[in-house]
Curated annotation (Swiss-Prot):
Source organism (scientific name): Listeria innocua serovar 6a (strain ATCC BAA-680 / CLIP 11262)
EC number, UniProt record: 2.1.3.3
Gene Ontology MF, one: amino acid binding
Pathway as given in its UniProt record: Amino-acid biosynthesis; L-arginine biosynthesis; L-arginine from L-ornithine and carbamoyl phosphate: step 1/3
Protein name in the entry: Ornithine carbamoyltransferase
Residues noted as binding L-ornithine in the record, renumbered to the chain: N168, D232, S236, M237
Catalysed conversion reaction: carbamoyl phosphate + L-ornithine = L-citrulline + phosphate + H(+)
Amino acid sequence: MTMYVKSNTTGKDMLSLLEWNKEELIDIIKLAVAMKTNPAHYSHILSGKILGMIFDKPSTRTRVSFEAGILQLGGQAIVMSSKELQIGRGEPIKDTAHVMSEYIDAIMIRTFSHEKVEELAYHAEIPIINGLTDLHHPCQALADLMTIYEWKDQLEGVKLAYIGDGNNVCHSLLLAGAMVGLDIRLAMPKGYEVDETILATAENLAKESGAKIFVTEDPKHAVTDADFIYTDVWTSMGQEEENAKRLADFGEKYQVNAELASIAKPDYHFLHCLPAHREEEVTAEIIDGNHSVIYQQAGNRLHAQKALLAAILEAK
């Protein structure tokens, strides 16, 4: 077997990033860059491997990037929803996990409850990948780190401002940044802060890595001299009934626009995990402008997840 990361990560889950250490994450990022540069070299390393994908939430980037990724590595994908499985009719997750482990080599699941993913991982004998839950979005964070690394050729000390809702994307970005040494500034209104336990975990990780974490209600304090400005939608899937209140609570103050971006570094880059609501969390001028790298960032979902698959499956 060829080792594609320095440590033996075969069989590891990816649930929240916390199953991995700094060195392993950086290895994945560097492998992702190598795969992007020379995809043909890796085109058969997962020959014969099957990835099962379970979707309880709509998906564009997660589904297409994972399905294309396993195919580009020589493997295959089976796409399912819980409604198509007996789990949707009440079969215990324990039984589903054990049975799936007899058929396929890994499961990627995109669902609402993070506890559901943890229970699946507890019972399964194969690696489980969190493709998004209400609490975490680790695969997005891998693509985010890769994009930052491509532009800066480093991660430590890079200044990243996140403006908006303290949601799953923010949680994973915060943990990832704390692990690798980013200078992270979060700006969000009261009532939309990040989970307290996740923030405390990130602060402990930052002590080990040298990362900096600064939380404020003032977007201008966060964005000042930033290398990257990141935002996400103010209303996530399942929160549609709260949309009017959320729009009012965030308002123009938390919108990434030309005025706010003007206090970042002159060569800053704009990030967004997509889908985006133009003229809400970000203006069209910014997201479609020269500083925006959102399509590179979205494209890196493919490469980062290919590297993850190579790391957790027994690549040839």
